[in-house]
From Swiss-Prot:
Pfam families xref list: ADH_N_2 (PF16884), ADH_zinc_N (PF00107)
Subunit structure: Monomer or homodimer.
Record bears the keyword S-adenosyl-L-methionine: no
Family: Belongs to the NADP-dependent oxidoreductase L4BD family.
EC class: oxidoreductase
Modified residues (N6-(2-hydroxyisobutyryl)lysine): K178
UniProt protein name: Prostaglandin reductase 1
Organism of this sequence: Rattus norvegicus
Residues noted as binding NADP(+) in the record, renumbered to the chain: 152-155, 178, 193, 217, 239-245, 270-272, 321
Stated role: NAD(P)H-dependent oxidoreductase involved in metabolic inactivation of pro- and anti-inflammatory eicosanoids: prostaglandins (PG), leukotrienes (LT) and lipoxins (LX). Catalyzes with high efficiency the reduction of the 13,14 double bond of 15-oxoPGs, including 15-oxo-PGE1, 15-oxo-PGE2, 15-oxo-PGF1-alpha and 15-oxo-PGF2-alpha. Catalyzes with lower efficiency the oxidation of the hydroxyl group at C12 of LTB4 and its derivatives, converting them into biologically less active 12-oxo-LTB4 metabolites.
Amino acid sequence: MVQAKTWTLKKHFEGFPTDSNFELRTTELPPLNNGEVLLEALFLSVDPYMRVAAKKLKEGDSMMGEQVARVVESKNSAFPTGTIVVALLGWTSHSISDGNGLRKLPAEWPDKLPLSLALGTVGMPGLTAYFGLLDICGLKGGETVLVNAAAGAVGSVVGQIAKLKGCKVVGTAGSDEKVAYLKKLGFDVAFNYKTVKSLEEALRTASPDGYDCYFDNVGGEFSNTVILQMKTFGRIAICGAISQYNRTGPCPPGPSPEVIIYQQLRMEGFIVTRWQGEVRQKALTDLMNWVSEGKIRYHEYITEGFEKMPAAFMGMLKGDNLGKTIVKA
């Protein structure tokens, strides 16, 4: 019998998550029925959205999330033993599936690319960057793009796609190490928002003419400052609001309606699951090719050990990571 370890939400978050919010449980999995497979987690993802999505869980539920898993036993001919899949299986070491919701890695996945990239640059974060920039912002060559949390899993891909499309890219991050990384990736301007005397002045210096596109991962006062510097007909893709996720008090006021009206700005929130089928497959192929060709670079922040899932999650929310946070089971 296989023992499955699962991290559950012991208590709903109040403010910043702590170890006491999580509980590790062990259950014995039953034998497989016909049509089922037994999966073993290889790599698991922790992402900012989980902080918000956990509100919908009941206490005692498994934490949600994607993982790269291997089929270790199969009674389903579509998924023979050894098949590598990506699926929303949550924070669990082993699971049983009837095959629904399991996505095989593309047959053309290059041997030189780590499997964990299917949770990062060639997975949900990469797709988020791709569609947010190209569809929501409707990016055009020659425009100026601003992205915050730019050294993270999504932001780092946003900046590199924008450069591929012939744009000027300004990125902000929360440490000098991250700023150096952004410059290595080819960002035109990058600065540490925590150490500049004035965010408003730093943004204006980076692009005196303002910004055509703003890819927002942070929200809050940061975004209120940016919106004042958007060009007429500017577009804003609202991907996340990590500055607000752990607040216990009221949120700060939003941006000035007058600015949005008279600058004729377009703001749109989005969730990447909107794009499915052929468009999603094309995006994954584009991302995979760009990475294989060295046009998009990546960095993974890997924590070893399934037992460290909560620590990796909390570290990611604090900004400890450079690039995509991954747990190797």
